[in-house]
Amino acid sequence: MKSKAIKWLGTLLGCLSLVVVVSAIAGPVNDKCLLSGNAVKKEATYSVGFCCGNCQGKFTKNPSASIAKVKAAPINDKCPLSGNAIKATASYKGDLIGFCCNNCKGKFEKDPDNLIKKVKVARKTVNDKCPLSGRAIDPKKTYTVAFCCNNCAGKFKKDPAKHIAKVK
């Protein structure tokens, strides 16, 4: 009798974990912008990745305690002009763009609206380490917050700890 109860409990916990992961992948956790209250837009969202469902669950219960640990990172993993590793960054409409050197950064800053087309977005989450455990993230375990526009998304990115408590 005890083993059946344990198996049942294990199955139930497995299903609940799947629901958490699927709900996180399905879309943002909010339907109103945290800053303006307007309807959210798909293109103005940010995702935080986690190493496991356990850390994701802890974050969901108390996001304010962990969001400060999320380090903003460039949305690209290689310089859009040279293809080299990133060493310098510039801000563009609330996003951080990575460049191999200040020369490429300067070229981008002179013509950002044209050169942004060369940026290949590699990062789906704003972090590459779990904000709770510090381990590498599992891209399937994310917490997505959406915004009505890139302006609000940029404000959130500058001070996420201030705004994350507004997520319902």
Which residue ranges define each predicted feature?
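Intrinsically disordered, low-complexity terminal tails/loops enriched in metal-binding residues
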Residues: 5-6, 10, 20-168
